[in-house]
Amino acid sequence: MMMRVFIAMFFLLALVEAGWPRLYDKNCKKNILRTYCSNKICGEATKNTNGELQCTMYCRCANGCFRGQYIDWPNQQTNLLFC
């Protein structure tokens, strides 16, 4: 029983140290959670004339390793995303 508790605590500690699983929105429509990845330019999100978001990816973003900021379009400018 104690061994199971120890293993469970070990995995919980490893999960907390590595960070909780991150989510990203490949369609660039939701709030993208920040992670601690490199600052390589990964993609570009733009808003076209009819108001739809277009997301162009320049590199592969590993699942859970994609960061950016909340996509807000007050002046319809380009918003860069990083991975």
Swiss-Prot record:
Chain residues in the propeptide: 19-26
Top-level taxon of the source organism: Eukaryota
Post-translational modification: Contain 4 disulfide bonds.
Expressing tissues: Expressed by the venom duct.
Family: Belongs to the conotoxin E superfamily.
GO molecular function term, any single one: toxin activity
Described purpose of this protein according to its UniProt entry: Probable neurotoxin.
Subcellular location: Secreted
Gene Ontology CC: extracellular region
Main location: secreted
Coiled coil: none
Domain text: The cysteine framework is XXII (C-C-C-C-C-C-C-C).
Secretion signal, residue range per the UniProt entry: 1-18
Protein keywords: Disulfide bond, Neurotoxin, Secreted, Signal, Toxin
Protein name as catalogued: Conotoxin Im22.1
